[in-house]
Amino acid sequence: METIAFRMVLNPGMREEYERRHAQIWPELVDALHNAGVRDYRIFFDPDSNHLFAILTRNSHHTMDELPQLDVMRKWWDYMADIMHTGPDHTPVQQPLEPVFHLNSLS
């Protein structure tokens, strides 16, 4: 298993809409993420900066690099493009984050 983190940027005033859309995430998108090896995916919001912080755990044999070729992934990105920073192809602008601390368990 591997954990990665990245930052995205939400457009101002779009938190509720972002949460609403994710509360109704398409089952076929959930299936695609699971099939690609995603085991846990959490997104946090910083209201002061409109930054979204994503933490994703995936298996070591993940196929996440293939997700952009899936119709459901492209459609989701198109659906989300009006409320967050994206590239010209509607891919979310993501800034990878580097780990600086990890506490697995208390002894």
From Swiss-Prot:
Keyword Isomerase tagged: yes
InterPro entries with a match to the protein in the record: Dimeric_a/b-barrel, L-rhamnose_mutarotase, Rham/fucose_mutarotase
Enzyme Commission number(s): 5.1.3.32
Protein name in UniProt: L-rhamnose mutarotase
Annotated catalysed reactions: alpha-L-rhamnose = beta-L-rhamnose
Record organism: Paraburkholderia phytofirmans (strain DSM 17436 / LMG 22146 / PsJN) (Burkholderia phytofirmans)
Sequence similarity: Belongs to the rhamnose mutarotase family.
Lineage of the organism: Bacteria, Pseudomonadati, Pseudomonadota, Betaproteobacteria, Burkholderiales
Active site residues according to the UniProt entry: H22 (proton donor)
Signal peptide residue numbers: none
Assembly behavior: Homodimer.
UniProt KW Isomerase keyword: yes
Sample GO molecular function, one term: L-rhamnose mutarotase activity
GO BP field: rhamnose catabolic process
UniProtKB keywords: Carbohydrate metabolism, Cytoplasm, Isomerase, Rhamnose metabolism
Localization per record: Cytoplasm
Biological pathway: Carbohydrate metabolism; L-rhamnose metabolism
One GO CC annotation: cytoplasm
Binding, substrate: Y18, Y41, W76, W77
Underlying gene: rhaM
Function noted in UniProt: Involved in the anomeric conversion of L-rhamnose.
